Curated annotation (Swiss-Prot):
Its main location: cytoplasm. The lineage of its organism: Bacteria, Pseudomonadati, Pseudomonadota, Gammaproteobacteria, Thiotrichales. The keyword Repressor does not apply. Keywords: Aminoacyl-tRNA synthetase, ATP-binding, Cytoplasm, Ligase, Nucleotide-binding, Protein biosynthesis. This is Histidine--tRNA ligase. Pfam families: HGTP_anticodon, tRNA-synt_His.
Length: 421
């Protein structure tokens, strides 16, 4: 029978790597607690219509990349390709964003897109999402950016990432700009790359995001979106930049930054790095003030961002910013298999009384010699021996594995005090 293998584009997190995730997740929680954001947990399956109405039917994600299927009732369902739409659905369904209410939320979990797998891009990938609802002013824009900046500083990578900013204006601004862009591109139709030609009919703004050099040269003299944005929104964007200057957050303006999701309005941003090759974006977000209303809720201001956790881990690893793994246990018990009913009770009592200790043993209970070999391999500092003689005398044997000392004895009723020292 052939050996089963993992699905292409999916990854196992092996025991030797799980500590990296635990480290990153602990830093994420530390920062989000600092800003008083509440964790929420969302289903990985949503109705397909949710993403059609939010991400956009013409977007690359919905048109090319979603995992869609019908359940046994014939309902069209989708493995979530991103988290914002599901979070908005939850907020609406549970009346968390009615007028006057505010919410500051975060979540972390797997997303699914059928893309060509490569370093930093997978078909199942983990994403941290941070979302805020009901805040109209600039202050929330700055706070959301500051959260990402604080996380990068906490991880020691702030000097290796760059914040890029743009404003998409209102939906009317974008409609007017789209017409001007199409008019400009008409003479260049035959010279555009294949993807850009497809986007002319479906999502022309995405052409600005093309990485093809020839297309970029064509766009060099194209109309600028900023020239079509209302005065008030342009002033708000300018003020946002001024506040970031005051906060000491480095950034650069990127007039071609448009984001690949249809729901964004106003401010959009990305954090990029030059350390990961083509997968340079590690964080992206912006305002999506119309999405709650578009999905059946009230008209509520909203902003958020997402961080690709695998890409962030790759960056941390490449820069040597991950801590060394410490798999060593603290205490290794060496037990007599004939007396397990007594010795295991002692071990379990110590585990309950001293939960901070990592305690292990050889569950095959071989000879004492073989158990000592496993104790040495475990990296434990101390081996505690409980055999028939120890039980008869009321004393456990103590062997310091990393020191050249004689074996000691400690009374069973003093073991906890001994291990606390």
């Amino acid at each position: 029978m052939s050996k089963l293998t993992i699905v292409r584009g999916f990854n196992d997190v092996l025991p030797l790597d799980s500590y990296k995730w635990q480290f990153l997740e602990s830093k994420v929680k530390l920062i989000l607690d600092r800003y008083n954001y509440s964790e929420t947990r969302l289903p990985i399956v949503e109705r397909s219509e949710l993403f059609h109405r939010s991400v956009g039917e013409s977007s690359d994600i919905v048109s090319k990349e979603t995992y869609d299927f019908q359940d046994r009732n014939g309902d069209s369902l989708t493995l979530r390709p991103e988290g914002t739409a599901g979070c908005v659905r939850m907020v609406i369904e549970n009346n968390l964003a009615t007028r006057g209410q505010t919410q500051k939320l975060w979540y972390c979990g797997p997303m699914f897109r059928y893309e060509r797998p490569q370093k930093g891009r997978y078909r199942q990938f983990y994403q941290l999402g941070v979302e805020a609802y009901g805040f109209d002013g600039i202050a929330i824009d700055l706070e959301v950016i500051a959260i990402a900046w604080s996380l990068f500083k906490e991880l020691g990578i702030s000097e290796y990432v760059t914040l890029e900013l743009n404003s998409l204006g209102s939906s009317l601004n974008r409609q007017e700009y789209t017409q001007a862009l199409l008019q400009y591109l008409k003479p260049y139709h035959a010279e555009l790359d294949e993807d850009s030609i497809k986007r002319l009919d479906k999502n022309p703004l995405r052409i600005l995001d093309s990485k093809i050099e020839k297309t970029q040269k064509i766009l060099a003299n194209a109309p600028k979106l900023i020239d079509f944005i209302d005065h008030d929104l342009r002033l708000r964007f300018k003020q946002t930049c001024q506040y970031l200057d005051a906060l000491g957050v480095r950034y650069k303006l990127n007039e071609n930054l448009v984001r690949g999701l249809d729901y964004y309005t106003g401010l959009v941003f990305e954090w990029t790095t030059d350390k990961l090759g083509s997968q340079s974006a590690i964080c992206a977000g912006g305002r999506y003030d119309g999405l709650v209303e578009n999905l059946g809720g009230q008209k509520i201001a909203a902003i958020g961002f997402a961080i690709g956790m695998e890409r962030l881990l790759l960056l941390l690893e490449d820069l040597g910013k991950l801590p060394n793994q410490d798999n060593a246990c603290d205490v290794f018990f060496i037990l007599d298999s004939a007396q397990l009913h007594q010795s295991l009770a002692i071990v379990e009592n110590i585990r309950q009384e001293l939960p901070q200790l990592k305690i292990d043993m050889d569950l095959k209970f071989g000879s004492f010699k073989s158990q000592f070999k496993k104790a040495d391999k475990s990296g434990a500092k101390v081996a505690i021996i409980i055999g028939q003689d120890e039980l008869d005398n009321g004393f456990a044997g103590i062997k310091f594995l990393q020191q050249n000392e004689e074996q000691q004895q400690v009374a069973f009723n003093e073991l906890i005090n001994f291990l606390e020292r």
